[in-house]
Amino acid sequence: MRQNRRFLRCQVTEQIIPRVGIASDAHQIEAGKPCWIACLLFDGVDGCEGHSDGDVVAHAIVDALLSASGLGDLGSFVGVGRPEYDGVSGTQLLIEVRELLITRGFTIGNVAAQLVGQTPKFGPRREEAQQVISDILGAPCFLSATTTDHMGFTGRGEGRAALATAVVWTG
């Protein structure tokens, strides 16, 4: 108790506030469409449908960054009715959200995302994907992948999903 009182009497002269965002994305698999996951093309694997390239990992990260910064979500950022975003890449979305955050006074601390799906085999390219996204955002990126043991739409191979968190700083 005494330690808490001492802390409360301290004056903070410069305040840096971390903000955390969480998000998810999911898309149905579309036969014959290129498979973009975490800004990498996976040859020989069907991609995901969508207004954009269907990169669930990149989309979840964009959404988590927007959530952490209080700037909305992917739908309000690009929307589905804007033709200039037809087929837009996850890479381009990450670049644009990074620039938006910088102009609003945010610094990206780090991002983490998990791919959920039966395909593609992500492990062999995980480090490559982490480096690509880290380079785009100018911040550490940590990625993982899992399956759902053949349960649900991802387990049946009907689609893919991703979960992401992001830490941004203000101040």
From Swiss-Prot:
One of its GO terms (molecular function) is metal ion binding. It is an enzyme of class 4 (lyase). Binds 1 divalent metal cation per subunit. Its EC number is 4.6.1.12. Pathway: Isoprenoid biosynthesis; isopentenyl diphosphate biosynthesis via DXP pathway; isopentenyl diphosphate from 1-deoxy-D-xylulose 5-phosphate: step 4/6. 4-CDP-2-C-methyl-D-erythritol 2-phosphate binds at D25, A26, H27, H51, S52, D73, L74, G75, T146, T147, T148, D149, F153, R156. It holds the Pfam family YgbB. Belongs to the IspF family. Homotrimer. This is 2-C-methyl-D-erythritol 2,4-cyclodiphosphate synthase. It comes from Corynebacterium efficiens (strain DSM 44549 / YS-314 / AJ 12310 / JCM 11189 / NBRC 100395).
